[in-house]
Regions:
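Conserved small/polar residues in nucleotide/adenosyl-binding loops
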Residues: 111-113
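Glycine- and acidic-residue-enriched helix-capping/strand-helix junction motifs
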Residues: 16-30
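Mid-chain, well-packed structural core segment of small domains
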Residues: 74-104, 108
Length: 113
C-alpha cells in the first residue's frame, strides 16, 4: 500500500497564474498539482492535493491526514499568520510537516484595508 502525502493550499492559491503573476509566477495551481503528481510517482506516494478558501475545510483536510497521511505540506496563504485552528490541527499530526510559501513572507509589506 502506498503512503499518502497531503499537499494543502489555502486562500487565493486557486488564482495562481492570474493574481499578480510578477510576484507569484505564471504557473496555475493545476500546473503545480501536475508537477507534484509526477514527482510523487518516483517515490511511490499517493498524492492528496487540496485547495480551499475556507479555513475550516483546511482544518478538516489536516484531520484526514492524521488518520492516513505520511506527511503534510501546507501553504496556508494568509492564514499562516493568523489561524490558531490550523496550528492546532497541525500540532495533532505526528508525521512530518512542511510549511511552504511562494514568496518571501518576511519581505511582504503590512496589509492595510
Amino acid at each position: 500500500m502506498k503512503k499518502k502525502l497531503y499537499i494543502i493550499n489555502g486562500p487565493n492559491l486557486n488564482l495562481l497564474g492570474k493574481r499578480e503573476p510578477e510576484k507569484y509566477g505564471k504557473a496555475s495551481l493545476e500546473t503545480v498539482k501536475s508537477m507534484c503528481l509526477e514527482k510523487c510517482k518516483g517515490y511511490s506516494l499517493d498524492l492528496h492535493f487540496f485547495q480551499s478558501n475556507v479555513e475550516g475545510e483546511l482544518i478538516s483536510e489536516i484531520h484526514k491526514a492524521i488518520d492516513d497521511g505520511c506527511g503534510v505540506i501546507i501553504n496556508a496563504g494568509a492564514l499562516t499568520h493568523t489561524s490558531i485552528g490550523i496550528f492546532g490541527a497541525l500540532s495533532m499530526f505526528n508525521g512530518p510537516k512542511i510549511e511552504i510559501h511562494i514568496t518571501n513572507v518576511y519581505a511582504l509589506s503590512l496589509i492595510h484595508i
